[in-house]
């Protein structure tokens, strides 16, 4: 994929995302960090905070609407709906290279290869969360090299793939897991498709 194509697509998606997002109106918090092996040019070129925060907010807005209608969040099922709705959400994103990505995947999942994204839920009890000003969702680790390779293989812009991975990862942090069975996979994919559609991002599974 050429840099020009990447930038053109990136600008189109940014326009759609900006319609959904105003940083001054955001209470949710997002922290982005990276391995020492990830250049600043990579962070600046691919991982724009405003873009990622907007996708985070769109995902949580979508989930909030379904929580109101009775959706259970597996990892936050001991937190009442009102508390979930009122708490400011916090998310950490860490960008890494393929070597560290492989090490982390081996440690976390006993898989000896780098994967596109790993999710580390906060796992805090409701009693502790109730005392905190923010509700920590956990941490997502994105392997940049794998993300870029997959985007090229799937013939999609890197920014589209990043947005999809972020939605996918947040759903994992909430306790949704496509590996539990076909019904869980179908539910999670439906959520992803609908969230991305709200940002004018095409179905990632087509």
UniProtKB/Swiss-Prot annotation:
Source domain of life: Bacteria
Enzyme class: hydrolase
Keywords from the UniProt entry: Cytoplasm, Endonuclease, Hydrolase, Metal-binding, Nuclease, Ribosome biogenesis, rRNA processing, Zinc
UniProt keyword annotation of Lyase present: no
Record-level GO cellular component terms: cytoplasm
Region (Disordered): 1-20
GO biological process: rRNA processing
Localization of this protein: Cytoplasm
Enzyme nomenclature, EC number: 3.1.-.-
Cofactor: Zn(2+)
Record's keyword annotation contains Metal-binding: yes
GO molecular function, one term: RNA endonuclease activity
PROSITE patterns assigned: UPF0054
Protein family according to the UniProt entry: Belongs to the endoribonuclease YbeY family.
Entry function: Single strand-specific metallo-endoribonuclease involved in late-stage 70S ribosome quality control and in maturation of the 3' terminus of the 16S rRNA.
PANTHER family documented for this protein: ENDORIBONUCLEASE YBEY, CHLOROPLASTIC
Protein name stated in the entry: Endoribonuclease YbeY
